[in-house]
UniProtKB/Swiss-Prot annotation:
GO terms for molecular function: undecaprenyl-diphosphatase activity. One of its GO terms (biological process) is regulation of cell shape. It comes from Psychrobacter cryohalolentis (strain ATCC BAA-1226 / DSM 17306 / VKM B-2378 / K5). The gene is uppP. Keywords: Antibiotic resistance, Cell inner membrane, Cell membrane, Cell shape, Cell wall biogenesis/degradation, Hydrolase, Membrane, Peptidoglycan synthesis, Transmembrane, Transmembrane helix. Belongs to the UppP family. Catalyzes the dephosphorylation of undecaprenyl diphosphate (UPP). Confers resistance to bacitracin. Bacitracin is thought to be involved in the inhibition of peptidoglycan synthesis by sequestering undecaprenyl diphosphate, thereby reducing the pool of lipid carrier available. It comes from the Bacteria. It catalyses: di-trans,octa-cis-undecaprenyl diphosphate + H2O = di-trans,octa-cis-undecaprenyl phosphate + phosphate + H(+). It is found in: Cell inner membrane. This is Undecaprenyl-diphosphatase.
């Protein structure tokens, strides 16, 4: 049993749990962390990075179970306690999910082959940071105070913006939260709609990648490493979800814009100056 490998799995789970719902690209930080620690082989890191997100999204399901159940019942029966428009949230999430499912399933291999390099990641980190500054500094007219108020048109726009997250370094949370803010959704509703939208997307991607590449797990230790990372990401994400919701009700996202830009510049320096190539 490699204790160092298990410790690295814990660290990777912590990184995932912290970064998954922040607008900073959790995948980018996971791969950078794996490279810095010399964590696992390339094939196993590729699988780990996708599957460990399952733990983080389980935290959303756990924390919002009552609300998600009401949304599901509203969608199926047209009745949900405390919802004036019971079907709205469920329909909006379906509409917002369709674009990324189509684009993701169609171009996933091409994106991984041609866009998964440090230059693309760095550029998208920097562009994303600049866009956060732009959205945060423009006047906002709120059209949706709660996630249940997001219209189908707005949901479709958020779903189209989520497709940008297929480009490495963009951040699914960044594209959806900042995109929702730009479209006039309140801060709290933007964060929560992004949380909910991640459920079908992340679960679908994790299951698909696991089914396709589970043969890279060749020992019980491999399964243990993946399991530890997933459990740790669940625990840390559960804490971070609550902190983020509290944060967005009082502050903006500019600190994350700076973090994206600084990280992007450092990755560019590493790539151009030292020939750095991402393991993923």
């Amino acid at each position: 049993m490699d204790i160092i490998l298990l410790i690295q799995a814990v660290i990777m789970g912590i990184v995932e749990g912290i970064t998954e719902f922040l607008p900073i690209s959790s995948t980018g930080y996971l791969i950078l962390s794996a490279d810095l620690m010399g964590f696992w082989t390339k094939e196993k890191v590729d699988l780990f990075v996708v599957v460990v997100q399952f733990g983080a999204i389980l935290a959303v399901i756990y924390d919002y179970w009552g609300r998600l159940w009401q949304a599901l019942m509203g969608l199926l029966t047209g009745k949900a306690e405390g919802m004036s428009n019971p079907r709205q949230l469920g329909l909006s999430l379906i509409v917002a999910t369709i674009p990324v499912m189509i684009v993701g399933f169609t171009f996933a291999d091409e994106i991984k082959a041609y866009l998964f390099n440090p230059i693309v990641v760095a550029i998208m980190l920097i562009i994303g940071g600049l866009l956060i500054f732009y959205v945060e500094n423009r006047p906002k007219a709120i059209i949706a105070e709660e996630a249940e108020d997001v219209s189908l048109k707005t949901a479709l726009m958020i779903g189209l913006l989520q497709c940008l997250a297929l480009i490495p370094g963009t951040s699914r949370s960044g594209a959806t939260i900042i995109g929702a803010l730009w479209l006039g959704v309140s801060r709290k509703a933007s964060a929560e709609f992004s949380f909910f939208l991640g459920i079908p997307v992340i679960i679908g991607a994790a299951l698909l990648d696991f089914i396709k590449h589970r043969d890279v797990l060749t020992s019980s230790e491999d399964w243990l490493v993946l399991g530890i990372g997933t459990v740790v990401s669940f625990i840390i994400a559960l804490l971070c979800i609550r902190l983020l919701v509290a944060w967005v009700s009082r502050r903006d996202f500019k600190i994350f814009a700076w973090l994206r830009i600084i990280t992007g510049v450092l990755v560019l320096i590493a790539a151009w100056g030292f020939g750095y190539q991402m393991a993923g």
